Design a protein with these regions (language model features):
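Feature marks short, surface-exposed loop/turn motifs that line or immediately flank catalytic pockets
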Residues: 40, 93, 180-182
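C-terminal substrate-binding subdomain of Rossmann-fold SDR/epimerase-dehydratase oxidoreductases
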Residues: 112-250
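Catalytic helix-loop patch of NAD(P)-dependent Rossmann-fold dehydrogenases
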Residues: 10-18, 25, 30, 39-91, ...
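Short, small-residue-biased leader/transition segments that mark boundaries at the very start
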Residues: 1-6
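Residue(s) in the substrate-gating loop at a strand-loop-helix junction
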Residues: 36
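Structural signature of the Rossmann-like NAD(P)-dependent dehydrogenase/reductase core
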Residues: 31-33, 85-88, 144, 175-176
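Alpha-helical segments that scaffold the active site and NAD(P)H-binding pocket
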Residues: 21-22, 73-74, 117-121
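Hydrophobic, Gly/Ser/Ala-rich alpha-helical and linker tracts in large acyl-processing enzymes
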Residues: 96-109, 116-119, 125
Length: 250
């Protein structure tokens, strides 16, 4: 639980500072940092842009991402010639269309889609939907689910931008999302629909640290990185299930 989160936070910070130190030592100039939409905390309005003020994070994970962003910004200001791009991931889901690469959570999945696929495969008895009394159209939380293949392409675009010296500043930030908010219940129903199965799920109490809603305004990434999310949600949920089936055959 929270003890593990704190330990992970410490590991993340130490590892990140080590990477920055090694970059200086070996004369490496460019870094792409995996940040997260958790840095926005509970935003006041949707969608969020890169200019949306960062609020206090609602989890140790979000807190760490905020700290790493700050360390990166300060390091790039202190070491001329170094450049960095922070990609604020929204909610990455899905697997490679080959069903050969995907997400393999250790223990109980902390993310929604692996829990959905494990429940569908009979590895988990029941999926808990945490809260259906939020001020959203169907009462469940809203997130921006980005296909992992699209996310990988955003990294390539970020690397190419720095390699081609196209950066406007030494430190740039981009939202990596679809620009569309999807509720948890909507996602569950969509998964059932595209994969022709019924999920055993129940409504559970709200979970501490969950924000009500967040989705991206990806205009900056569309414009400056020449990147946009292309894979439809239906296809992503299909690949997630194909990956789970592939795991079952191993």
């Amino acid at each position: 639980g929270s003890e593990m989160c704190i330990r992970d936070s410490g590991n993340n910070l130490t590892s990140f500072m080590n990477v920055i130190g090694l970059m200086r030592e070996f004369g490496r100039r460019n870094i792409v940092f995996s940040s997260s939409c958790t840095v926005y905390g509970e935003p006041e309005k949707q969608p969020v842009t890169e200019q949306t003020p960062r609020k206090p994070a609602t989890s140790p994970y979000g807190n760490t991402k905020q700290m790493c962003e700050d360390i990166l910004r300060d390091s790039l200001a202190a070491y001329p010639g170094m450049k960095g791009i922070a990609l604020r991931y929204f909610n990455p889901i899905g697997a490679h269309p080959s069903a050969l690469i995907g997400e393999l959570p250790r223990g109980v999945p902390q993310n929604l889609v692996p829990f959905i696929t494990q429940t569908a495969a009979g590895l988990r008895e029941c999926l808990s939907v945490f809260g259906d009394d939020y001020p959203t159209p169907d009462g469940s939380c809203i997130r921006d689910y980005i296909d992992v293949v699209d996310l990988a392409k955003a990294h390539v675009a970020a690397i190419n931008r720095m390699a081609g010296d196209k950066n406007k500043q030494a430190y740039e930030i981009f939202n990596v999302g679809t620009g569309r908010g999807v509720s948890v219940l909507e996602l569950v129903r969509k998964f059932e629909e595209v994969n022709h199965l019924k999920l055993n799920y129940k409504i559970a109490p709200r979970r501490a640290g969950d924000i009500i809603a967040i989705w991206a305004d990806p205009t900056l990434a569309n414009t400056l990185l020449g990147w946009r999310a292309e894979r439809p949600l239906e296809e992503t949920l299909r690949t997630a299930w194909q990956w789970q089936l592939h795991l079952g055959q191993r």
